[in-house]
């Protein structure tokens, strides 16, 4: 797919010695040709022609969510390894079926949950798991965005899953990555006229005893720039990562991005976090796993199935107003 996220990967992979994008497949010639010319790679409008001519080792699926299933099935039939943008599909059952099909054909699949590779989020995980923070006492995160105006399918919950599956999934996934299995969830939100849950606030109750409040809004009014924030309080420190653009005194947008550690017994510090492109990191990670014949432990398929179960429970809580247990 020659869309915006595909362009993000193309920019990220410039100069990579591990991964080379050899072609783009699209369904509209105008966009496919423009992408082809921008990145100097051939384009195809025929799936069969692309596979026959290019004979790829892997495909990177950057198409609308509702198209993922059929594209994945075709790649499995061709014996081609698969990287797929999130959300993979919109149900745990469908995801499990596709993963089972891939396993039978010895095809690797990794869903691109990029937050697991994000430098600051990865540093937070390292701090928590090392015990440096002490006991975690409360957790809050948000991910806020105006609604994407560049497509119509995003407004159809049967095609996109709405903000719940497209945006909120990032922080739900990351919280599970940090704290493990979830006991139950409770959520409140606002549903659009078309049925999308684009405004969601979720309370996650983890089996380990930690509770987290997560907000995902894809309906912010006005010229709101995409922003993320996570705050973890613990017995030894408070940790906050903020990434947003704010208006300064000159009424121009100024980017604020830092990971601050507020120590209990000394002055706060801005954490030194080695910077790299997380989109490149996750793509090269998958390529290394395939070539070295090792599992994609950072994003196992079983995690994707579990996250989709959590999202389904959140959706049911939104609809019923009740706490939902996770199987």
Predicted regions and their residues:
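Predominantly a Rossmann-like dinucleotide-binding segment in NAD(P)-dependent oxidoreductases
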Residues: 115-194, 200-203, 321
């Amino acid at each position: 797919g020659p869309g915006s996220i595909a362009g993000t990967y193309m920019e990220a992979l410039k100069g990579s010695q591990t991964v080379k994008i050899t072609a783009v497949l699209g369904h509209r010639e105008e966009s496919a040709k423009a992408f082809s010319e921008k990145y100097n790679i051939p384009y195809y409008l025929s799936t069969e022609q692309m596979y026959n001519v290019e004979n790829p080792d892997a495909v990177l699926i950057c198409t609308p969510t509702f198209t993922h299933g059929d594209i994945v099935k075709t790649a499995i039939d061709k014996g081609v390894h698969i990287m797929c943008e999130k959300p993979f599909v919109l149900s745990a059952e469908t995801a499990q079926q596709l993963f089972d099909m891939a396993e039978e054909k010895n095809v690797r699949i990794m869903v691109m949950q990029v937050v697991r590779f994000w430098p600051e989020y990865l540093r937070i995980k390292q701090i928590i798991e090392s015990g440096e923070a002490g006991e975690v006492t409360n957790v809050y995160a948000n991910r806020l965005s105006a609604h994407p105006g560049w497509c119509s399918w995003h407004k159809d919950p049967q095609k996109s899953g709405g903000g719940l599956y497209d945006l909120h999934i990032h922080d739900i996934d990351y919280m599970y990555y940090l704290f493990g299995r979830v006991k139950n969830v409770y959520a409140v939100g606002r549903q659009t006229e078309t049925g999308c849950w684009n405004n969601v606030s979720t309370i996650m109750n983890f089996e380990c005893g930690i509770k987290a409040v997560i907000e995902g809004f894809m309906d912010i009014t006005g010229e709101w720039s995409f922003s993320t924030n996570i705050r973890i309080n613990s017995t030894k420190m408070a940790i906050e990562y903020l990434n947003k653009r704010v208006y300064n005194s000159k009424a121009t947008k100024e980017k604020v991005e830092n990971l601050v550690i507020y120590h209990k017994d000394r002055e706060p510090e801005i954490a030194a976090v080695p910077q790299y492109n997380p989109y490149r990191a996750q793509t090269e990670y998958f390529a290394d796993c395939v070539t070295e014949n090792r599992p994609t432990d950072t994003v196992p398929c079983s995690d994707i199935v579990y996250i989709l179960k959590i999202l389904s429970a959140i959706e049911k809580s939104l609809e019923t107003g009740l706490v939902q247990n996770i199987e």
